[in-house]
């Protein structure tokens, strides 16, 4: 908050405040989470406006995930249409981003686009991940494996968690 008090348009401060709010929302009850998420949405929309490429289009990616997972009206403001707009844009900007591709696969599957969802899930599952990044990316690989397991093609590529020798 102090950094943003000095510069209300600091993309880094806006983005990471939104991320922190998201983590708090995950750990709080449903009502508190819904209150935090609206403020988080505002911060992320501002990041998109100021620099949509920051953190590999992290604001687009986060907004896409929020809109996809939240219930729609009248309970909340979830919207698969908005989710698709943001995740498509994140994918256009950073097509090799594992997190974006995992979230995109999940959304596409839920929208009935199973073949396209599987394509993105396969990308995530075959992406080389350094040993030191395994824990960070495990959640996204799990999302991709879940999408893959729900598609008709029962073959699951297991190219992840390659240990690089340096």
Where does each model-flagged region fall?
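Short coil turns that delineate tetratricopeptide repeat
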Residues: 8, 52-54, 95
């Amino acid at each position: 908050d102090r950094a943003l008090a000095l510069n209300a348009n600091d993309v880094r401060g806006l983005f990471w405040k939104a991320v922190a709010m998201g983590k708090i929302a995950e750990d709080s009850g449903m009502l508190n989470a819904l209150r935090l998420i609206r403020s988080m949405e505002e911060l992320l929309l501002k990041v998109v406006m100021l620099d949509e490429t920051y953190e590999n289009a992290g604001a687009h990616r986060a907004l896409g995930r929020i809109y996809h997972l939240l219930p729609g009206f009248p309970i909340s403001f979830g919207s698969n249409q908005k989710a698709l707009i943001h995740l498509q844009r994140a994918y256009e900007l950073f097509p090799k981003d594992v997190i974006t591709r995992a979230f995109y696969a999940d959304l596409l599957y839920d929208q009935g686009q199973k073949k396209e969802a599987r394509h993105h899930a396969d990308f995530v599952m075959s992406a080389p991940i350094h040993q030191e990044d395994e824990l960070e990316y495990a959640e996204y690989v799990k999302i991709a494996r879940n999408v893959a397991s729900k598609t008709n093609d029962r073959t699951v590529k297991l190219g992840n968690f390659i240990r690089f020798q340096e």
